[in-house]
Amino acid sequence: RYPDRTSSLIMGGAVMKLNLRGQILMRLGVLLKSVLPYLVLYRFFALIIMPKKSHSEARNLFVREAKKLYQKEFKKWFTLASEINPLLSLFRLRDSQIPTLYIMGEEDHMFLPSITKLVQNHIESTLHVIPNCGYVVNVEQPNIFNEVSIKFINDRKSNN
């Protein structure tokens, strides 16, 4: 709506499209959210999104933060998240032409493929993939995440 208010974006572990597996999981979650305790669902989804042993710190953080939500809030969030694909398609189709850096983990099997495709079609977008890293890049590799982010910000400053 107001593109002049944003000079650049940095998106770590961006979600721009739920792949088929993600869509099925979200629909399954919507069906089960009234039957299963919400923390069971959250732990399950955290394990699906971040399956490797090296992702355990990020997975534990994910679950720890979920505990701060009340079940009613979680159900609202879950319903919202399951309906987000149509809205995200607008962002994928329409190039904002705002310089955007996507920082993704090499082991992010759920969201990296769609970001890779998106960056090919958006002129001002770049992708930095962090090796040996999953979905929550700023937790698993904070030093690399910060270095790449600071470089992007400094490059924008020198271009202005």
Name each model-derived stretch:
Residues 96, 102-104:
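Short beta-strand/loop motif that positions the catalytic acidic residue
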Residues 109-115:
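Conserved alpha/beta-hydrolase "acid-adjacent" motif
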Residues 66, 108, 134-137:
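Glycosyltransferase donor-binding loop in the core domain
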Residues 92-97, 120-123:
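Short, conserved loop/helix-junction motifs that constitute active-site signature segments
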Residues 20-22, 38-94:
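Conserved alpha/beta-hydrolase catalytic His-Asp/Glu region
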Residues 14, 105-106, 132:
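Cofactor-binding loop segments of dinucleotide-utilizing enzymes, especially the Rossmann-like FAD-
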Residues 1, 5-36:
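Flexible "cap/lid" loop of the alpha/beta hydrolase fold
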Residues 123-160:
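Catalytic active-site module of serine/aspartate enzymes centered on a nucleophile-bearing elbow/loop
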